[in-house]
Amino acid sequence: MATATVATTPEGIPVIILKEGSSRTYGKEALRANIAAVKAIEEALKSTYGPRGMDKMLVDSLGDITITNDGATILDKMDLQHPTGKLLVQIAKGQDEETADGTKTAVILAGELAKKAEDLLYKEIHPTIIVSGYKKAEEIALKTIQEIAQPVTINDTDVLRKVALTSLGSKAVAGAREYLADLVVKAVAQVAELRGDKWYVDLDNVQIVKKHGGSVNDTQLVYGIVVDKEVVHPGMPKRIENAKIALLDASLEVEKPELDAEIRINDPTQMHKFLEEEENILKEKVDKIAATGANVVICQKGIDEVAQHYLAKKGILAVRRAKKSDLEKLARATGGRVISNIDELTSQDLGYAALVEERKVGEDKMVFVEGAKNPKSVSILIRGGLERVVDETERALRDALGTVADVIRDGRAVAGGGAVEIEIAKRLRKYAPQVGGKEQLAIEAYANAIEGLIMILAENAGLDPIDKLMQLRSLHENETNKWYGLNLFTGNPEDMWKLGVIEPALVKMNAVKAATEAVTLVLRIDDIVAAGKKSGSEPSGKKEKDKEEKSSED
């Protein structure tokens, strides 16, 4: 590592610039160190890429094991120290939050671009020229995706299902992907809203509940909400049809006074009257609820035992300590309103569901709220024989939900299997000579990096990458073969659109943007100044966590 903490004047007098323990890496060494970090992260993810990719076993400091091939999860659980590595993880997380998929594509493409940039640096091409060439290549890549993308609407159920199948195909749950893809498409279509002429999908309205037990094929879609609580009183009904639901953000308990108060009781009759008055207060609250016609109460706060007794006597099913998010979803699903004051509750505030029922799921009891007229919130109850299978199924479903939502929102899809990448590379090679100069080399390097994704797909499937790449290049010379990609199960080039390997155009575009942004950012850095670590100080991670906690309290 090149270090320079001391400089000298023309007279040779030393001048201390940085504190003792600090280090500085600059020039080509800084560039190479940053590129090496990007390449190292790519190497960690490369073997998981594509439907024939492998899984990673991640063990944390407590010994907890995660088995996954989800790019965002792997990066999240990697304890990275290098600042450039952390930067790449942030970009990958941004990709995951924006489009729910394509994190591996973004990181691996960034790694390939970094490798090609390193080759150009060895040829004495300045980083600024490489960045300029990469930016021009990015524009062509995005333009290509926009031009070849196929329009898709929310009514194209078959295409949406294929998008879900493609996303699930690379996950550990691929054996149940046909069944899960149907659930995903139905769930997203149910919560989608038309605003003006654009479709909007808020995936927060798809509740995911996990319960260990059964198999992945026991996973079910509920047109309503699953509340992970049981009915509060054994005397209450466990099943209510044509349910009228009161959603309460208020407790069914005798509230304590805000100010400290003392009550002096001189004889037992006063104590009896005191308890009787408490009971009357609770009875009045229950009577007010019953008067609205409610036969189900779902409460965010507590329900006193006396109130439970009176609710049971009136045949009302009640649930307490429900999560705030569950109440909000129930309001959307049933058309009800969350009420903070029981005195203000009216029949107009009640939600409706065809059925509210307590069911045993595994070893636990849960309350299912189903059959709302037009539920804008739905639930997916995930089952699986192992907890790790359940967790991986959740990750797979979240990615699939995100990709289907992306297609509905954006209205465009492209074929997978490397078809888009080879088409981009072809157009970049035609464009590069028009630019000329050293930038031409950078654009051609970008084309080679894009093709690197196809070679990794082929390698992970046990195929000869160069042989398959040449076959695809030859096929794409014919304009009618734009959707030809690599069928990784047969090893032959095929029309990926006809084969049903379809991906959101938005995911591809965001991956190209994220990868190019990451590499151009790295190429612009020519100096790394690292402060020395203070002895006996807290780990930086703990300090950051404490800062976050303090800011959240404020």
Curated annotation (Swiss-Prot):
Bias (Basic and acidic residues): 540-554
Protein keywords: ATP-binding, Chaperone, Nucleotide-binding
Highest taxon in the source lineage: Archaea
UniProt-annotated stretches for the region Disordered: 532-554
SUPFAM superfamilies given in the database record: GroEL apical domain-like, GroEL equatorial domain-like, GroEL-intermediate domain like
PROSITE patterns assigned to the protein according to its UniProt record, in alphabetical order: TCP1_1 (PS00750), TCP1_2 (PS00751), TCP1_3 (PS00995)
Annotated InterPro entries: Chaperone_TCP-1, Chaperonin_TCP-1_CS, Cpn60/GroEL/TCP-1, GroEL-like_apical_dom_sf, GROEL-like_equatorial_sf, TCP-1-like_intermed_sf, TCP-1_chaperonin, thermosome_alpha
Role played: Molecular chaperone; binds unfolded polypeptides in vitro, and has a weak ATPase activity.
Name of the protein described by the UniProt record: Thermosome subunit beta
